[in-house]
Amino acid sequence: AFDKAINKQVMVDQLMLGEGQVAVGPMPKYHPYYDENLKPNTYDPEAAETMLKEAGFNFDKEYLMIVPKGNQVREQSALLIQQDLEKIGVKVKIETYDFTTLLQMLREGKADLGLLGGGSNIDPNESSVILKPNDARNYSLVKDPKWFDLANEGASKVTKEERKKCYDAYQEALVEDQPYIWLYHQNDLWAYSKRLAEVPRSE
């Protein structure tokens, strides 16, 4: 429901000036193992609110979202998430912490929501570490091993075709079950001097 309530496109358009893409799962669309058949949740706050009401969600509670200090895009993303969730009646309090403290709070379950980011690795198995039960990097504290096992099966295969089938199933399970909400994949921007020779330029 929260995934439907958050307007990710606004984050890409306003905070990144279009230099990014809305995330469906842990892999961006240009990743060689991205599943082209993924069906993302569409932004639909009315449907999100209905889902929460049907599930008996507690709208009276104020939920704590913790955010790392110093990353402007991430801090602004937190404000947009807060606004989007308040539109469907979910009260969110934002607190910022240094990165070490934030990670420890997540590991100890001292927050309802946490905002983190990471790079996109060419290894499709890289994202599964945050889904491994009892791992220190499992910040959402998920106990079900199904997602980690799906990714691990892909890592055990030899050919790209075999691995692709496993990682497609892995991504589809993540989109269906939503143990995490992936917000966006931000483009890497590089600046260089025009005095450098043999550098391909878009202009």
Region roles according to the model:
Residues I6-V10, L15, E19, A55, ...:
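A generic secondary-structure signal for well-formed alpha-helical elements
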Residues P28, P32-E49, F57-D60, M105-G109, ...:
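Short, solvent-exposed loop/beta-turn-alpha elements that line the ligand-binding surface or hinge
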Residues A1-Q83, C166-A169:
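Append "and occasionally in soluble cytosolic enzymes with long acidic Gly/Pro-rich linkers
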Residues G18-Q21, G118-G119, Y184-L189:
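Short, solvent-exposed turn/loop segments enriched in Gly/Ser/Thr/Pro and often Arg
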Residues A151-A155, K160-V175:
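Short amphipathic alpha-helical coiled-coil/interface segments
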Residues K53-S120, K160:
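Ligand/substrate-recognition segments at binding pockets and active sites
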Residues F2, M65, L85, L106, ...:
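Hydrophobic, well-ordered secondary-structure elements that form the walls
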Residues V10-L15, T100-P133, L174:
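Pocket-flanking alpha-helical
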